[in-house]
Amino acid sequence: MSDGLQGSLKLALNEIMTNVFDHSGSAKGCYVCAQAYEKEEIIRLCVADFGVGLFTRLKEKYSNLKNSYEAIKLAVREGITTRSGQEGGYGLSHIRRFIEVNAGKMSILTGDGKAVWNYGGLKTKLRKQTMHLPFSGTIINLEINVDRESVYFLINSEDEIF
């Protein structure tokens, strides 16, 4: 794995972990699992928290939300934040863009909604699923291609990595 890709992966994990501790309300924090698949040249990363979920947290500020799937789609848009009077809302949008540049996959499951982005192949696919057994927290799965030299840099010039 290149140093640049390793840095992008660390940044993505840091953003997800920051979201857990800043927004989830989980008393237990989160669980993180990762595995490298050498033959397929991919890394799979999963972060799960048992907090209030995206729909509950975002509904506090965005009262027009109707369901968990809408909350997921809103959460990955740049500038969407629950903080009042503060800039933010770049974490999940940057992660989604990194996965797009990497031609990887990302899924977010929260409440009764699940969204899956598949950037591999010729077409980008966003798939919606409704879960029969709702999950109160949030689960984020990333599949990263380690054979690519793709590096995603933050677009906002005010963002600092170091």
What would you call each of these model-derived segments?
Residues 49:
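Acidic ATP/Mg2+-coordinating residue in the GHKL
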